[in-house]
Amino acid sequence: MLKPHPEHKEQPQDSFTPSGDSTPDASMAEERDFMRSVLPVYDSFHPEDSSLALPLANKLTLADAHRLNRLQQQVQLTLSRKKRKPKPADSSLAESQSSCQISSSSSLGSLHLKRTFSVNHEATRSLRMVDRSQWPSMEPPLFHRGYGSFRYTPKRAGLCLGSNSLTLPSAPTTSHFQMNKLPLRYAHSEVLRNPRFAGLSAATQIPSSPVYENPHTDDTDDVFLPSTSVERGRMESEKHTLQQTLCKQREGGFVALEQSENVSWQSRVRKPSLEFVAGRRPSQTGSLISMEEQSGSLGRIEKLEVKQHAVTTLTKKGKPGELSAEMTLKEAVNLLTQDNNMETQIAAANFIQNQCFNSPDAKRKILHLQGIPKLLKLMQNDSEELQWAAVSSLRNIVFENNENKMEVKDCEGLPVILRLLKINRDIETRRQLTGLLWNLSSHDLLKEHLSREAVKPLTDSVLVPCSGISEGEDPKLELLADPDIFYNATGCLRNLSSAGPDGRKVMRDCEGLIECVIYYIRGTIADYKPDDKATENCVCILHNLSYRFDCEVPRVDSPVAQKPKQTHTETSNPGCFIIKTPKNSAENLEADEDYPALEENGSPHGVEWLWSAITVRMYLSLIAVSTNQHTKQASIGTLQNLTACSGEISQAIAHFIVQKEGGLSQVKKLLQEAEKEELRISVSLLKNISRYRELHADIVKQVLPELVAILPNSDRNVEQPIEITVTICHILINLSQASASNTCAIINQGALPKIISISSKDNGFGPTRAGQAACVLLHTLWRHSELHSSFKKAGYRKTDFINNRTVKAVNSARE
């Protein structure tokens, strides 16, 4: 019987993901997240101030053709708006025709606009200048080249300025706004006055072009430019004054924002959602070593590169402009308790996260400095940014460090984590929380505790909304759906499913867990995505939950019905060994008995899904279409577990696989092409199926040649796993015990020389396991007396079948 499927190993979290990164829906962004079209100036720091940012002096001369086009557009807009205005009942404007004459010189200062209007003098309403405040958009169609503006790129390895922000990205100047490429959540023009980042030192560049405005004007567009020398002189004077002011501010309060781009915090890095980054750590089938979710790990886990030697600095004592010496872990842990400075706490948590990335010494220091309880306290803060920073740091701290995992448990950290997972709605934070739980679940001493406490919250908070099983029922739950969160949660449950009988019982009894997992797998098959990254975890969960299900699951209504067996038909055995079976032989009489058939239940509930016909078909589909080695192995292993028990359910499933679904055709392909591990599981499944005599004809007809071909030759140097050889010998024993015709089929496939060769193998203390199984098989073959003459004709003697080695092996097997 197959052991439970192994669990995933842990993975650390640097600034990126499976610590998880995805951009939350822009529709959820608050008003402060939206972009303004202009920048604040030296003395205007009001939240709603969006005054005009004027261009540089050397950019004031624009092309005549472009200027004429802009003015003509404005005039046409004015005329069209005036024509659309309603006419009063008692007085109306006459049909007015306006003609525009535009003359221009080489300078914008001599630009003139002449208008002639024909107006009904009885009208009491006077025409006014264009009211730009009523334009459909406050933004110009295109910013002219030379206009400096902040642009925060979402691809910069730093913190974006949303509600989940932690550090500032680099802010290069751009020639114009690229509105189709700039997500609103990442764009802010009022960043320099945002008090949330007063204590942070980030890699930010001040635009090279100074920004200035006229505080007395209400202009929001750049259409009307100064047209006289007096106005241009006044503008030059204001520009010079503003340059001096900004230079002073840069020497003071803003200097902390001008670090090199090479200085970066190990903070969140947004990544594309759903498309899985190639290369993950395998499930290590056959090993009981846990696997933890590791973000940014080296090797086969998905990873985004980060700068490991980035110099991280903090402002000291809250004084703007002062940079402290290089931060130490002790200082960072102490800063976690500064409740009056949230930005400093976030920065300290990010520094700890950075240091603990691939640094075992840093993790040990955090334990001795009592940093874990302080981070757990920060997780209870109302700030999402602080929660994210604390969870991300804790995730790295516990990676591959069992002492830190136990410290989280001893500090009552698990209730804090699960409570935050239940109430938090931020996708980034939920990714970190599920990744943290995955890492914690890899410690064997925590699995039982986590099985009791975490299975139900993970099912309700993650599996239900992310699997799609509740789609259309609750729109709020759909907002929580995220593939990385689901992947982390199923990784945690995969570990917990190998905790033992008690853990398996909790998971089987958890309402909705099995339904969600199966619903998700069936969805990926229907969408032609059987190699989805979370599907492997889901199949491994079911693999472990199916282990010894017949013994561990309370008796329920049997899902089988008695079905009369069809008349047994002998398989043709072309070759030198031919035998005729009497009509009233024991094997034919036995073939007339009834056998259990798996009922087609369209709506299983809970644990019934484990042995449902729908689920069995699902596993066969995965075997056929999946290219993920571990998904395929887990699918075969689950069928092996389901057919391994001695009850009616296992017998019914075996008949369903062979006779109803034609599953042996898939097994045959595995025997021909599979790797060693898949081959081992496949022959184990066939061994379970070979226990039922009514299925022997199908086995002999479809897969016997492949089984014999796998047996090692005496002259073949290829190393054959001994377990595979032993299992094939047991299959042949089951076949030969039931029927002399099966024995003829085995010999006609050329198996006898191989079996005799295997039986002679010795390890120095006696026959090997494979040798013992081959000896029992030879003894079984000789029991068919009607074949003795055929054996002699083929050149074999009785001593080839019955000798001291075979007799000793048979006696040992009986004991």
UniProtKB/Swiss-Prot annotation:
Family the entry assigns: Belongs to the beta-catenin family.
Function, in words: Required for development of the heart, potentially via cell-cell adhesion and modulation of expression of cardiac precursor genes. Plays a role in desmosome cell-cell junctions and their intracellular connectivity.
Protein name per Swiss-Prot or TrEMBL: Plakophilin-2
Sequence ranges of Basic and acidic residues compositional bias: 1-12
Species annotation: Danio rerio (Zebrafish)
SMART domains to which the protein is assigned, alphabetical: ARM (SM00185)
Renumbered residue ranges of the record's region Disordered: 1-31, 76-105
A GO BP entry: protein localization to plasma membrane
Gene: pkp2
Lineage: Eukaryota, Metazoa, Chordata, Craniata, Vertebrata
